[in-house]
Every structure is written in C-alpha cells, then in structure tokens.
C-alpha cells in the first residue's frame, strides 16, 4: 500500500488557523484515494503559522499524483482557514502544491502542483477539466459592475464583506477610513478642531496649530518656503503630482500672454516666442476642472473651483519657476493674467489657486483613476481569465494584493455620496465623479507606459531638465521591471506564436479592454497581444502602475499637502477678477476653515502611511512559482532593485529636498492604501 507524507502550512495572519475537520484526498493518473482526516491525537492541528506533517496510506496505486483535494467540515462553529501550501512526499517524488487561499464554511479546494502551465501544456483530461472549472467558478465570483456611468468597471460588491474571501483584507478594521482618519487626527492632536466648520483661521501662522513640526522633513521645508516661486515650480517636477507639467510647443490662444507682460522673468533676453522655440517654456493646464460642479453638501459653506493655466519658465539655473497664471480658461477682462511682478498677495493667491487645482486633479485623476481604478481593472480581469496555474497569474497576483479590497472600502466610505471625501474637498458632492468621467476619455495605454508618457510631455531630456527626479528614478524602476517580465515571459513563451495561441492570456487582455476601457478604441489599449515583446511591456505596465506609479503619487501626500496653504482641498471664495484688491485677510478667508483643514490633514496623514507588514517591490513571500529559472530571475530582479536603492540614496545625500518616493525599498508591491 503506497504511503505518503503530507505537510500542511497554515497562514500566519490573524485568524488563519482553524479547529474544523480537514480531509485530504489524492487524485492520481490511475485513480482517486478515499478522503483522509488529517488529525494527530492530543495535538492542536492547523494553528496560525503552523507547519504540520501527516502520514497518509492509501489502498491502491494512484499513479502520478495530479491533484490534491482539501475539504473542511465544521467542528463547532464555522472557522475559516488560510492554507499556504501543501507538500507531498511520494515513494518516488516530492511535489509542492501552492495555495495561499482561504477555505470558508464547509468548503473544499482542489490544488495543482506548483509548476506554471499554459493551457496547451495540459494534455490530461482531469487537468483540463480542473482548469476550466476554476475559471467558471471565478467568473461567477468576480463579476464586473458599473459604479458610475463612464467609469472603468469595478468589482460587483457593495461592501468589503461581499468580496470573495481571498481578496479581503485580513482585518477590515485596519482599513476603515472613518476610524483611520479619526485616529490620524487624534495622533496629530488636531481632533479638537475637527468639528469647527465655518471657523476661519486668523492668519498663516494660525495654521501651525494643526501642523506637526518635525525638523528636517520635507513638510517642514514646504511650510517654510511654500510662498517662494522656486518651491512652487519644484513641485511640478518632484511633488506628489509630477505628471502634469509639459513642454510648451506653442502658446495657447486662450492664454494671451505677451513678452512685455513676462519680460522681467525671462533671463536670456529673448522674446517669449523665442523662449518657447528654445524649449524653455512649460505649461500646466487644468482645463479638466472647467465647469465641474463645486461641493454643495454643506449649505453653510460656499465652495469654489477654478480651472487655471500656469506658464512656467526654465531659468538660467535650470530651475522651473512660474511666470504667468490665468485662473480660468476663457480670457477676458474679469479673468486677468497674474504675474510675478504683480502685488505680492495677488500673485500669492493666484499660486494658491493653482496648488488647490493641482490637489483636485492629483487626488481624483492621477491617484484615484490612473492607479487605483486602473489596477482594479487589471486585478478583476486576472482573476476572471487566468487560472492559478497560469504563469501570468503567478506573476501578477502579488501586484493586485488588496487592491480590489481597498477600492471597495473607498466606494463604501470615502468617495461615495456623503462620504468622507465630501467633508473637506471642493470636488466632493459629485464633482470628483464628473472629473473621472471626463478624464477616462483621455486615458490611454501609452500614458501608462512610463517612458512614452515622459516623452509625450517633452520631459525626457536629462540635460534640459536635470532636476526631474521622478523621471530619473521612474525610468530606472521601469527598466528593472521590464527586464524581469521579459525573463519570465521568455521562460514560458518560446516564441511569438505561443503568445498568440494562449487564449487565456488573450481573454485577460480583452477583458481589460472591453470592461476597463469600455471598448474605447481611442484608449490605445490592446485587444490582443501578438508578441513576447508586447506581452513584456503589458506586464510592465500592470506592475509599474500598481507599484511604482502609485508610490510616487501617494506616499508624498503628507510631505506636500500637510501645510494647508500649499494644497488647499477647498476654497471658500471665488477667484479674483481684478488685480490690486487681494489682502492677506482675504486669502485666509478663502482658505479652508478649521474643520475642513483637520479632515484634510487626517486624510493625507492616513493615506501616506505604509501598511503593517508591507511587502515592497521584489518581495514575493508567497511562493506561487516553484521553478528554479523563475526564482533566479526574481533574485536578479531584487539585485537590480537594490542597486537602484543605492543610486537614489547616494543622490539624496545632503539634499535639503531628497526625492525617495521611487526608491524600491519604499515602493509597495500593490495598491493597498
């Protein structure tokens, strides 16, 4: 009678263990065993973090083991169990069966060995059937839903507990936005102000009552220098929204600025048109905000939005500084162009309006749409179309970890009607929805390809723009990811023909196009992939968006937005329509009140924190891959990332404003906050 040694590993997260009965069946090429109860006398099996071994003897020859079936039956109360993996020592072999899934209720799970396989590799009927049944079950669990008209489709779940257990957070309490924001305000000692809506601050210094002063930090430097043009310009390159600035190839007609108006800012003694031709003029246009409805959820507080155009100049020191700001799109007598030569407070308020507009576009488009929602689309499509044995599933699963869950919590508490977003933001109350609906029309595949996106904005020259660290570090990380994905692709796809014939892969790509991009041809998202090179690029887009891009635009929020005048989430008076009338009192009365300031501060603090036990780029503790060539590729990937960490650390030495958001040791694997 054949005898097997079965090793069972239970997860180490909270509540991973179980007291339920666990049964195991072995399915081989020659037959299926009876189910065996895995139990040791006087021993507490399947405790959290435990690795337990059992001897299993079967009555007949099973042939080569193909599958392992695990069944969980209730002992007292239903007790979910997180199974990491099973190993099987047979008379002639040693087989690993990765799982990394929850078994809930009176459930069962059927596992394949850990070798990654394309559909063409499965010749045995039982394996083909297992593959098909897994996808059929997943497609019933992971359903598309339209949360708002025009949005990329999201998961069909009203709240976190409705999600499949495998993609829920280990502890929902840890990602409760209401709890976390309130806790953040308590930790920042600002909760005494959190209900003081309609109560204005007295002056700029008064904002220090809610500012946590930590020496030698970016946030402190922002507080001390936020009014300076150099600091204003620097943020377009290396702040938390470094994706909008582009080289100005032609002055737009809607911004009728002349050489005479900006002459005192031009250091090369050239006309404005000549500076444009020389490539020294840059522009940031917030046209997306034009006509967006401002927040009206609080009848006691009027809130306002602008749609500014900001012209910037590269001076002789190669630094970017603002030279002209128009606060709305249509030129006219009541929409003056503000200049550095204007009265101090005229110019300052114009810059504050730009910073406020930048905050809105950052939160809703750069952050929410282009990382969170896009990554969720990739995640849902992956679960629907790629079985766990598929190499692309094994590659991507770490990079969609908790993404669907965090987005579901956001729809439940944060960006829903009367959610937390409405409390402090001028684009709350529906404006943020309008913004996404507009921006989706311009979302393209090439905008997610980092090198292409940088080049399209004319920002690719390191000689012309030497202080664009977001670009420099992003390209290093992109190249490291692309090198890694190319290696993995070459292991499983020997030529382009294999890529084209992988129907599961093609269905995954098609799902993203049809449901994520809503079948919009102008998006440029591929409907299919026809080469190994294009597959590697596509996988790099998925991983880079979920990891590096999200890190770049998320984890600097407290640094750059905690000083309220530098990133006001709302404005309580409309943009100035004339020059020479702005006073310091008017600026303070325009900035957010005490209550909204506190909710904003709690939000940017909470969103900027890493998760407990965060997994950073290159960390793959769940061993979905067992093959040596892939593990060697992972090792090379980690070494490349470590080299990038060292390059960035060396550059940042002695810098007053270090840029570290794209250092791989600070880039989480996935969008999970």
UniProtKB/Swiss-Prot annotation:
It catalyses: (5Z,8Z,11Z,14Z)-eicosatetraenoate + O2 = leukotriene A4 + H2O; 18-HEPE + O2 = (5S)-hydroperoxy-18-hydroxy-(7E,9E,11Z,14Z,16E)-eicosapentaenoate; (18R)-hydroxy-(5Z,8Z,11Z,14Z,16E)-eicosapentaenoate + O2 = (5S)-hydroperoxy-(18R)-hydroxy-(6E,8Z,11Z,14Z,16E)-eicosapentaenoate; (18S)-hydroxy-(5Z,8Z,11Z,14Z,16E)-eicosapentaenoate + O2 = (5S)-hydroperoxy-(18S)-hydroxy-(6E,8Z,11Z,14Z,16E)-eicosapentaenoate. It is a peripheral membrane protein. Its cofactor is Fe cation. It holds the Pfam family PLAT. The modification Phosphoserine is found at residues 271, 523. Residues 118-673 form the Lipoxygenase domain. Binds 1 Fe cation per subunit. The keyword Cytoplasm applies. It comes from the Eukaryota. Signal peptide: none annotated. GO terms for cellular component: cytosol; nuclear envelope lumen; nuclear matrix; nuclear membrane; perinuclear region of cytoplasm. PROSITE patterns: LIPOXYGENASE_1, LIPOXYGENASE_2, LIPOXYGENASE_3, PLAT. Keywords: Calcium, Cytoplasm, Dioxygenase, Hydrolase, Iron, Leukotriene biosynthesis, Lipid metabolism, Membrane, Metal-binding, Nucleus, Oxidoreductase, Phosphoprotein. Fe cation binds at residues 367, 372, 550, 554, 673. Serine phosphorylation by MAPKAPK2 is stimulated by arachidonic acid. Phosphorylation on Ser-523 by PKA has an inhibitory effect. Phosphorylation on Ser-271 prevents export from the nucleus. Phosphorylation at Ser-523 is stimulated by 8-bromo-3',5'-cyclic AMP or prostaglandin E2. It is found in: Cytoplasm; Nucleus matrix; Nucleus membrane; Cytoplasm, Perinuclear region. Residues 2-117 form the PLAT domain. Ca(2+) 1 binds at residues 17, 79-80. Ca(2+) 2 binds at residues 18-19, 44-45, 47. One of its GO terms (molecular function) is arachidonate 12(S)-lipoxygenase activity. The record marks 103 as: Essential for stabilizing binding to COTL1. SMART domains: LH2. Homodimer. Interacts with ALOX5AP and LTC4S. Interacts with COTL1, the interaction is required for stability and efficient catalytic activity. Interacts with PIK3R1; this interaction bridges ALOX5 with CD40 after CD40 ligation in B cells and leads to the production of reactive oxygen species (ROS). Interacts (via PLAT domain) with DICER1 (via Dicer dsRNA-binding fold domain); this interaction enhances arachidonate 5-lipoxygenase activity and modifies the miRNA precursor processing activity of DICER1. Belongs to the lipoxygenase family. This is Polyunsaturated fatty acid 5-lipoxygenase. It comes from Mesocricetus auratus. The lineage of its organism: Eukaryota, Metazoa, Chordata, Craniata, Vertebrata.
């Amino acid at each position: 009678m054949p005898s097997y040694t079965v090793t069972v590993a239970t997860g180490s997260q909270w509540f991973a263990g179980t007291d339920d009965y666990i049964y195991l069946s072995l399915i081989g090429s020659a037959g299926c065993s009876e189910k065996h109860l895995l139990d040791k006398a006087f021993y507490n099996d399947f405790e959290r973090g435990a690795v337990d071994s059992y001897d299993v003897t079967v009555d007949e020859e099973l042939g080569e083991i193909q599958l392992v079936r695990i069944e969980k039956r209730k002992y007292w109360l239903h007790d979910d169990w997180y199974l990491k993996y099973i190993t099987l020592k047979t008379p002639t072999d040693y087989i690993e069966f990765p799982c990394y899934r929850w078994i809930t209720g009176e459930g069962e799970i059927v596992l394949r060995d850990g070798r990654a396989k394309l559909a063409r590799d499965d010749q045995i009927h039982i394996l083909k059937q297992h593959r098909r049944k897994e996808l059929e079950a997943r497609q019933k669990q992971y359903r598309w839903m339209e949360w708002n008209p025009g949005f990329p489709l999201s998961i069909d779940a009203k709240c976190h507990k409705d999600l499949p257990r495998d993609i829920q957070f280990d502890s929902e309490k840890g990602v409760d936005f209401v709890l976390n924001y309130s806790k953040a305000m308590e930790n920042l000692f600002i909760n005494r102000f959190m209900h003081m809506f309609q109560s204005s601050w007295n002056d700029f210094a008064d904002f220090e009552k809610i500012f946590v002063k930590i020496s030698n930090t970016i946030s402190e430097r922002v507080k001390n220098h936020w009014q300076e043009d150099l600091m204003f310009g620097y943020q377009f390159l290396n702040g938390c929204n470094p994706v909008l600035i582009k080289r100005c190839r032609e002055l737009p007609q809607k911004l009728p600025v002349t050489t005479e108006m900006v002459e005192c800012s031009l250091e090369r003694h050239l006309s404005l048109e000549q500076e444009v031709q020389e490539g020294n003029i840059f522009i940031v246009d917030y046209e997306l905000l034009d006509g967006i409805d401002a927040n009206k959820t609080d009848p006691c507080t009027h809130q306002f939005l602008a749609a500014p155009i900001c012209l910037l100049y590269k001076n002789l020191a190669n630094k970017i500084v603002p030279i002209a700001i128009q606060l709305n799109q249509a030129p006219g007598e009541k929409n003056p162009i503000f200049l550095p030569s204007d009265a101090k407070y005229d110019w300052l308020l114009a810059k504050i309006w730009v910073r406020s507009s930048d905050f809105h576009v950052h939160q809703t488009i750069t952050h929410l749409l282009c990382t969170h929602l896009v990554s969720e689309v990739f995640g849902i499509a992956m679960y629907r179309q790629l079985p766990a044995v598929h190499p692309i599933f094994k590659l991507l699963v770490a990079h969609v970890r908790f993404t669907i869950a965090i987005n579901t919590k956001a729809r439940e508490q944060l960006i829903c009607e009367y959610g937390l977003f409405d409390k402090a933001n001028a684009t709350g109350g529906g404006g943020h929805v309008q913004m996404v609906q507009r921006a989706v029309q311009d979302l393209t595949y090439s905008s997610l390809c980092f090198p292409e996106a940088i080049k399209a904005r004319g920002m690719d020259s390191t000689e012309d723009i030497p202080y664009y660290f977001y670009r420099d570090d992003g390209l290093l990380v992109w190249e490291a990811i692309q090198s890694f994905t190319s290696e993995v692709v070459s292991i499983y796809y020997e030529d382009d023909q294999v890529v084209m014939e992988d129907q599961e892969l093609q269905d995954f790509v098609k799902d993203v196009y049809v449901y994520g991009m809503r079948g919009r041809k102008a998006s440029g998202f591929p409907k299919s992939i026809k080469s190994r090179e294009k597959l590697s690029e596509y996988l790099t887009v998925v991983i880079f968006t979920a990891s590096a891009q999200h890190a770049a635009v998320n984890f600097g929020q407290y640094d750059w937005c905690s000083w309220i005048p530098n990133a006001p989430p709302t404005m309580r008076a409309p943009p100035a329509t004339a020059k020479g009338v702005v006073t310091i009192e008017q600026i303070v009365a325009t900035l957010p009140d005490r209550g909204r300031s506190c909710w904003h501060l709690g939000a940017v603090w909470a969103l900027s924190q890493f998760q407990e036990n965060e997994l950073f780029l290159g960390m793959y503790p769940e061993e979905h891959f067992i093959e040596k060539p892939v593990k060697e590729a992972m090792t090379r990937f980690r070494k490349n990332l470590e080299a990038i960490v060292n390059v960035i650390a060396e550059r940042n030495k002695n810098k007053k404003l270090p840029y570290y958001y794209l250092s791989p040791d600070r880039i989480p694997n996935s969008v999970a906050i």
